[in-house]
């Protein structure tokens, strides 16, 4: 059976009234987290660019923190804010994903259709489940394809739920999203650019446009996955279709939140750095052992000389050196002064990163990292198996709120966001203010 058809069959029956309380609570936590990290990006250079670009897309859909635009640009704009800090949630499997990237699109079409918070929660549950299954099916990274290719399919599944598309329309929406829009992994190769966040924003934009097209009757190729020139035959012959045999509502519980503003493979690196009790001036050498994905993604050649925020938040040596020196890791770590700080650079020169095959075999059930520091006084070793926020070591509600407040959120907003079921999506969006 065509995968798009399986997804379409799954989408329609999902109903808020039948969702478990822990699933509803988790969806609310992701909404809170998404708004928190979006607010933290308000002064970022890409956001200022997007505000100027928005002048060309006049519309009536409310944007996060003020302004109005067209549905597709609102999805792009909201998602760029959510994604930019690399501080939103993550799913790690054969392919990684930042599932809350799709929430920016849900804010847009939820506002367009005058829907309520409970409709938003339904869309999140659907989108997360589809995203998790796609990431379980194959690795895109190893094929040179970017994970936002899966994001847009997951997003359009959630948007199909929001728009109440029937099964045939949902298949068309998936096809109109996937077939024209295969994203290249070059986005995340070497020195990173603003497009690291833009790729997710663009995927949300494309999913939004495809969903609206399908709602109005436009058809797409009927077999976007299984067709002769479809996704599986052209890109992913190893695609494991069986993962779609047991679609549920619990995919969101397998995804993870971030305590620190770093690429997820570096969350454990920050924790390890904070546990070390050493004088930076005494360091002779630092050996780091981790799994293949972490070494490949955050310790490749370009990550040893980061020159911008986009590369620094994907740089294991920078993140570890900063943490050892400052005994904290927050957004100020990405100032130009910090990125080019000589003391941090000197510590980076003493770091070596190695793949530990045992750790590779454990990943992604665990995210192990071991940091061994050799000093004038001897050796100190710290191992972290699962950082705080990982799905098997989740942040509690108080920690989620603490993150929201530290990113300049307001307590009254939190009180509202925990009770959004009957609130209009557009009212939720317009009530959230900037810094």
Model-derived features: where do they sit?
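Well-ordered alpha-helical segments within folded domains of soluble proteins
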Residues: 100-106, 151-158, 204-209, 266-270, ...
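Generic structural signal for well-ordered, non-membrane alpha-helices
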Residues: 5, 9, 33, 125, ...
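Terminal-appendage/accessory-domain detector
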Residues: 1-95, 192-205, 212-435
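Generic structural signal for well-ordered alpha-helical scaffold segments
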Residues: 110, 160, 273-277
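Residue-level detector of well-ordered alpha-helical segments, enriched
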Residues: 23, 27-31, 101, 119, ...
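Glycine-rich, mobile lid/loop segments that gate access to catalytic sites or pores
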Residues: 114, 118-205, 221-228
């Amino acid at each position: 059976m065509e995968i798009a058809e399986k997804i379409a069959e799954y989408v329609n029956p999902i109903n808020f009234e039948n969702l478990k309380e822990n699933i509803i609570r988790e969806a609310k936590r992701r909404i809170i987290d998404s708004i928190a990290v979006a607010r933290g990006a308000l002064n970022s250079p890409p956001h200022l660019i997007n505000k100027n670009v928005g002048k060309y897309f006049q519309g009536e859909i409310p944007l996060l923190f003020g302004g109005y635009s067209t549905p597709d640009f609102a999805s792009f704009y909201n998602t760029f804010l959510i994604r930019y800090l690399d501080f939103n949630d993550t799913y790690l499997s054969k392919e990684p994903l930042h599932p809350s990237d799709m929430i920016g699109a849900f804010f847009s079409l939820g506002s367009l259709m005058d829907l309520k918070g409970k409709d938003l929660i339904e869309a999140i549950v659907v989108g997360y489940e589809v995203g998790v299954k796609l990431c379980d099916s194959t690795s895109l990274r190893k094929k040179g394809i970017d994970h936002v290719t899966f994001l847009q399919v997951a997003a359009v599944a959630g948007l199909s739920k929001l728009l109440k598309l029937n099964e045939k329309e949902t298949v068309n929406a998936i096809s109109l999203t996937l077939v024209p829009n295969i994203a290249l992994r070059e986005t995340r190769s070497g020195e990173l650019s603003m497009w690291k966040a833009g790729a997710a924003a663009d995927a949300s934009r494309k999913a939004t446009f495809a969903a609206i097209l399908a709602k109005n009757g436009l058809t797409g190729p009927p077999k976007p996955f299984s067709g002769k020139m479809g996704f599986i035959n052209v890109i992913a012959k190893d695609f494991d279709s069986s993962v779609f045999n047991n679609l549920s509502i619990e995919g969101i519980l397998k995804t993870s939140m971030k305590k620190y503003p770093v690429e997820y493979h570096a969350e454990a690196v920050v924790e390890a750095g904070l546990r070390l009790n050493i004088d930076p001036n005494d360091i002779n050498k630092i050996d780091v052992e981790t799994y293949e994905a972490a070494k490949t993604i955050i310790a490749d050649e370009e990550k040893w000389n980061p020159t911008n925020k986009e590369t620094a938040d994907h740089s294991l040596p920078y993140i570890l050196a900063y943490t050892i020196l400052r005994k904290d890791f927050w957004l100020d770590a990405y100032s130009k002064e910090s990125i080019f700080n000589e003391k941090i650079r000197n510590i980076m020169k003493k770091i070596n990163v190695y793949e530990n095959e045992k750790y590779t075999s454990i990943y992604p059930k665990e995210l192990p990292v071991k940091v061994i520091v050799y000093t004038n006084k001897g050796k100190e070793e710290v191992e972290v198996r699962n950082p705080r926020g990982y799905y098997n070591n989740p942040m509690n509600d108080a920690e989620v709120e603490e993150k929201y407040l530290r990113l300049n959120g307001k307590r009254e907003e939190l009180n509202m966001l925990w009770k959004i079921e009957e609130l209009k999506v557009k009212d939720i969006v317009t009530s959230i203010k900037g810094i």
